């Protein structure tokens, strides 16, 4: 049956592939290094709650998310594993942080005092990880003398547990290994200074996906894999140390077919004109679903194992493909946007290259109006339609 009760445009998520990738990462870092699975951005478009449930079964040590809302969604779905919020949480939401045992990133003593005040109000202690900016220029302490002074003060706060300290590489996926080493040395020098003051922080972490593969010295107490959990490498310049498996297919189906003559215009702005008698198919996927408009007249999808070009501009909800050279196309035939069909593949990396971005952005821009259908070892185990 070509159509079922789920929207024709969908993402199939392979949870067994995600768990495989997780195990591959464990092989690299060894049993003494903890793993924080980074599942922000709805697990890079894969659906955070399902992914978290399966990684929790695999024994993941921590989850990393960007916002309070992402963390609360996981708690509401029954996730018990510790969750670190990488970003800023407004003071108005600190009650939720404490109530749901979430770990907050901190890089300011005034903020730490606000969090401690809320913790004591609830008769609890909130876990915090201190963020150090060693060269990314985003958030975190850049004055290391101030950092040391305030961290030592935080360590004595009754309402806080100073569990972790971390930083983030700016160029681990690039060729600038010297800058990575410079960042790492800054981070370790601060930690050494704190330890001389008799403060030993349990979880020290700096390694993202690229550093896991390229910079073994940076693994420390915990690593933070993100995109490699989801089957893609962070860049072409990282070592291919692991056998990553494809974790999703982004697909749709043909909903309209028409025969048109040569000289027929397709799409907004008349940006494509047929050069011969052609068969044009319409598929119900557009830029509101995550198919980038820059792929207009500039990319090929898969139909019956053959590459077919997008013709005309990608619309908000639909686009057109030229299927003239594919025999026997029918309404309901599957079209692959990202993934494999009949041993041919449209990779997330190739799409990212075409629009001059990274796989992380391509995955995370697949919108929530696209249902996620979940499989394990080829068996469908569930689906999520965010709009129901």
Curated annotation (Swiss-Prot):
- Give the signal peptide, or none: none
What molecular function terms (GO) are annotated for this protein? alanine racemase activity; pyridoxal phosphate binding
Q: Which GO terms describe its cellular component?
A: cytosol
Q: What intrachain disulfides are recorded? A: none
Question: What reaction does this catalyse?
Answer: L-alanine = D-alanine
Sorted keywords for this record are:
Isomerase, Pyridoxal phosphate
EC identifiers of the protein: 5.1.1.1
Positions annotated as active site in the UniProt record:
40, 268
**Which cofactors does this protein require?**
pyridoxal 5'-phosphate
Per the record's keyword annotation, is Hydrolase included, yes or no? no
Q: Name one Pfam family in it.
A: Ala_racemase_C
Which EC class is this protein assigned?
A: isomerase
Tree of life domain: Bacteria
GO BP annotations listed? D-alanine biosynthetic process; peptidoglycan biosynthetic process
Q: In which pathway does it act?
A: Amino-acid biosynthesis; D-alanine biosynthesis; D-alanine from L-alanine: step 1/1
As for what it does, the entry says: Catalyzes the interconversion of L-alanine and D-alanine. May also act on other amino acids.
Q: Which family does it belong to?
A: Belongs to the alanine racemase family.
Name assigned to this protein: Alanine racemase 1
What is the species listed in this Swiss-Prot or TrEMBL entry?
Answer: Caldanaerobacter subterraneus subsp. tengcongensis (strain DSM 15242 / JCM 11007 / NBRC 100824 / MB4)
Q: Which gene encodes it?
A: alr1
């Amino acid at each position: 049956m070509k159509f079922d009760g789920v929207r024709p445009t969908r993402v199939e998520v392979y949870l067994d592939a995600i768990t495989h990738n997780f195990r591959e990462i464990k092989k690299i870092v060894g049993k003494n290094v903890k793993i924080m699975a980074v599942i922000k951005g709805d697990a890079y478009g894969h659906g955070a709650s399902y992914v978290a449930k399966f990684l929790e079964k695999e024994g993941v040590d921590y989850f990393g998310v960007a916002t309070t809302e992402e963390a609360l969604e996981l708690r509401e779905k029954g996730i018990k594993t510790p969750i670190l919020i990488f970003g800023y949480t407004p003071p108005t939401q600190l009650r939720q942080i404490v109530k749901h045992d979430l770990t907050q990133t901190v890089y300011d003593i005034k903020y730490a005092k606000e969090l401690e005040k809320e913790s004591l109000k609830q008769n609890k202690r909130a876990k915090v990880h201190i963020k150090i900016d060693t060269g990314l220029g985003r958030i975190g302490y850049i004055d290391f003398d101030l950092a040391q002074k305030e961290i030592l003060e935080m360590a004595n706060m009754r309402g806080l547990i100073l569990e972790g300290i971390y930083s983030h590489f700016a160029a681990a996926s690039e060729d600038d290994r010297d800058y990575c080493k410079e960042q790492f040395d800054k981070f370790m020098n601060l930690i050494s200074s704190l330890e001389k003051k008799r403060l030993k922080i349990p979880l020290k972490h700096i390694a993202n996906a690229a550093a896991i593969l390229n910079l073994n010295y940076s693994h420390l107490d915990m690593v933070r894999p993100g995109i490699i959990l989801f089957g893609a490498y962070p860049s072409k310049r990282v070592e291919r140390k692991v056998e990553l498996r494809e974790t999703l297919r982004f697909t749709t189906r043909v909903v309209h077919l028409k025969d048109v003559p040569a000289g027929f215009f397709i799409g907004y702005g008349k940006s494509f004109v047929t050069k011969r008698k052609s068969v044009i198919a319409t598929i119900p996927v557009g830029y509101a679903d995550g198919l980038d408009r820059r792929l207009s007249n500039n990319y090929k999808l898969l139909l019956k194992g053959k590459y077919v070009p997008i013709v005309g501009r990608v619309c908000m909800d639909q686009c057109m493909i030229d299927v003239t050279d594919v025999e026997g196309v029918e309404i309901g035939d599957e079209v692959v946007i990202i993934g494999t069909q009949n041993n041919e593949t449209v990779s997330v990396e190739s799409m990212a290259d075409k629009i001059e971005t990274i796989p992380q952005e391509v995955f995370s821009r697949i919108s929530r109006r696209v249902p996620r259908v979940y499989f394990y070892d080829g068996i469908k185990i569930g689906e999520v339609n965010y709009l129901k």
